[in-house]
């Protein structure tokens, strides 16, 4: 995987990221929370013979001619975005991480793992709150169920960050994600790259996770 560096890469797909992936032997690009407006970059990837799957939740760019507008989708092999004008998905206000989670959910179901989505429910709730989505409809359900899971998570990184923030696990509320824990996760991405936060969430060693959590809290 690659996490864009805020200074070197900007936000989302860039020509540099695509060429780097190609030179490393990657034949497929799967985006999360970006790509819907990266038509030129995706054209480059297709010219290089790569498969591109976009998962995003941002508005689809429009091309205007007079008073008439036409949605402009990138030439990806698949574009999953609830904001597509031809998408009948009822909850248009899900965040980008939830869009990716739902794609993963479908893939796991096809692979005979219909309940595997539950493993990532806490992260879906975390992302929904952290991205300041409106907590109505499906978002409210995801958040309510995800908070229950988060309070008893076995994710070493989340446990460490909760402890470093001085929060009792069984007391975690949406407020804590939005104003205490969430900003710690976002901080590294705002400064340069979100790599440090991802390292925390994928860490399995308790002491190492505690060290990273303390670093994030101190930012």
Question: What residue spans do the PLM features occupy?
Answer:
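N-terminal small/polar loop signature for handling phosphorylated ligands or for N-terminal nucleophile
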Residues: 1-66, 70-72, 80
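Hydrophobic helix-and-loop "lid/oligomerization" segment in the mid-to-C-terminal part
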Residues: 1-28, 48-49, 75, 109-219
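Contiguous hydrophobic segments
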Residues: 41, 46, 54, 102-106, ...
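Amphipathic alpha-helical transducer elements in NTP-driven molecular machines
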Residues: 39, 94-97, 101, 140-144, ...
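Short, glycine/acidic-enriched loop or turn micro-motifs at the edges of active sites
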Residues: 36, 59-60, 84, 134, ...
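Low-complexity, flexible helical/coil segments
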Residues: 36-38, 64-67, 94-99, 161, ...
